[in-house]
Amino acid sequence: MYEYIRGQFQGISKDYVVIELNNIGYKIFTSGNTMSNMPKVGEEVLLYLEQIVREDFIGLYGFTTREELEMFKLLLSINGVGAKAALSLLSISTVNNLKYAIMMGDEKHITRAPGIGKKTAQRIILELKDKLKPDELTSEEGELIEGINDNSDYSFNINETLSALMALGYTEKEAQKALEKVDKTLSIENMIKESLKLLMR
């Protein structure tokens, strides 16, 4: 079992990042939040890990904070919520805002995550509401729940940008290379524009 990995950030894709350690590139699935916190290519980064092993799959999932890792594991404990859904939930806002939404029973916020329907949102609230502690959140963090911008879904924006660039005739590798140099907090439209500037040089 892995605790964490410290290595060089080498790239980003639709739902994972690549970390190089001892000349080996590790494919690590992650959330939009963690993707947005990646350094420049070649710089060092530390990710806290969880390994998932199934009959047909072995994967590493990593996050820049222990808090996000623990929330990921908590979401996986819910029947019907897999790794993909958990990452989707962790991509729509900060961990604290997700916790706040669960404690407040805010189904609308939770169903913003791609792949999460009303029934799943209700199950998440029912099973986790009593496990989360209100004193873990400040009032300021709680207030943020009303002002979350759609652009906080980093992984969704990255996917859409990559798809748009590939639709324009660029290869996935070319699109990814350009996107690595673009600010991930921009809107999809602006990420496409900035990526095209790099690709047309």
From Swiss-Prot:
Native species: Clostridium perfringens (strain ATCC 13124 / DSM 756 / JCM 1290 / NCIMB 6125 / NCTC 8237 / Type A)
Coiled-coil segments on the chain, per record: none
Record note on quaternary structure: Homotetramer. Forms an RuvA(8)-RuvB(12)-Holliday junction (HJ) complex. HJ DNA is sandwiched between 2 RuvA tetramers; dsDNA enters through RuvA and exits via RuvB. An RuvB hexamer assembles on each DNA strand where it exits the tetramer. Each RuvB hexamer is contacted by two RuvA subunits (via domain III) on 2 adjacent RuvB subunits; this complex drives branch migration. In the full resolvosome a probable DNA-RuvA(4)-RuvB(12)-RuvC(2) complex forms which resolves the HJ.
GO biological process, one term: DNA recombination
Protein name: Holliday junction branch migration complex subunit RuvA
Gene3D superfamilies the UniProt entry points to: 5' to 3' exonuclease, C-terminal subdomain, DNA helicase RuvA subunit, C-terminal domain, Nucleic acid-binding proteins
Location relative to the cell: Cytoplasm
Domain-related comment: Has three domains with a flexible linker between the domains II and III and assumes an 'L' shape. Domain III is highly mobile and contacts RuvB.
UniProt GO MF annotations: ATP binding; four-way junction DNA binding; four-way junction helicase activity
